[in-house]
Amino acid sequence: MSTKHRIRDKYRIELREKDHLPPHVHLTGAGVDVQISLETGVVMLGKAPKAVLEEALAWVAAHRAELLEEWNLWHP
């Protein structure tokens, strides 16, 4: 597991080495576990406070290429 970004010192965007398809990241912390698709940029599973989710989705969109590159290294 690799923490890629922190939001408000309570939440983390994580890329997990041993994870299932499709490519995605997890938004975790403060009782939240949301899966965000790297292919579509939308929430696959879970819920989070609106402002936190908006910030996470914007960060994932801005870093999508590098996240997908790392995902593909871990999941050849």
Regions inferred by a protein language model and the residue ranges of each:
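C-terminal structural segments of small proteins and small subunits
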Residues: P49-P76
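Hydrophobic N-terminal alpha-helices or hydrophobic patches in metabolic proteins across all domains
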Residues: H5-R8, A58-W59
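Short, solvent-exposed secondary-structure boundary motifs
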Residues: T3-R6, V25-L27
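Intrinsically disordered, low-complexity and often Lys/Arg-enriched segments
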Residues: M1-S2, P76
